[in-house]
A protein has these predicted regions:
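Beta-strand/loop-rich accessory regions of lumenal/periplasmic or secreted enzymes
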Residues: 1-177
Length: 178
């Protein structure tokens, strides 16, 4: 990413991810579900990001995201959702490519299967702090505490990708000695 100048060319998206503002909220309720849609304005890229949560009586929540960009918006390498869970929710099980980290452009050496790990085991101490522990072609992911209580994520169609980290990338310091 540094070789092609991505950190410089993508600053608008990075700033937008830190400064998004709520532009609107819509709710609706039916006999079968309740829907909450939040629209965020990303000022730096003149874009809108819509996140829709549909809640079902079973406890299931369906999350759908949609990004509206302008034709002159900077290139966007990918888009996703990050969220925090309690620190004791550190157990992970998934069905996808693993067990090593892998990305869509370099995942042929990892096999599709069922894997178990922890958030701590996903950490890779790269010299320059960066995303790590990424997994591709995931069908489902369970994040739980040691008692097995937590969240289950199921890909709607195709697959999903994920990584689990104890810290935000921006909060990690360099690990090399000076």
């Amino acid at each position: 990413d540094y070789g092609n100048g991505m950190p410089d060319g993508q600053q608008g998206w990075k700033q937008a991810s830190k400064n998004f503002k709520i532009a609107g909220i819509r709710t609706s309720t039916s006999v079968t579900n309740t829907n909450l849609t939040i629209t965020y304005r990303l000022q730096e890229t003149n874009s809108k990001y819509h996140v829709s949560y549909t809640l079902y009586p079973s406890g299931m929540i369906h999350v759908a995201c949609h990004l509206e960009t302008q034709p002159d918006a900077p290139e966007l390498p990918r888009i996703g959702v990050r969220f925090r869970v309690p620190t004791d929710v550190n157990q992970l099980e998934y069905f996808g490519r693993g067990p090593e980290e892998n990305y869509c452009d370099r995942n042929n050496g990892t096999l599709i299967g069922y894997y178990k790990s922890t958030a701590e085991q996903q950490y890779v101490p790269y010299v320059r702090p960066q995303e790590n522990g990424h997994k591709t072609e995931t069908r489902w992911l369970a994040l739980t505490d040691k008692n097995g209580e937590g969240l289950l994520f199921i890909a709607d169609s195709n697959f999903m990708e994920f990584n689990v980290s104890r810290n935000r990338i921006e909060a990690v310091s360099y690990t090399h000695l000076t």
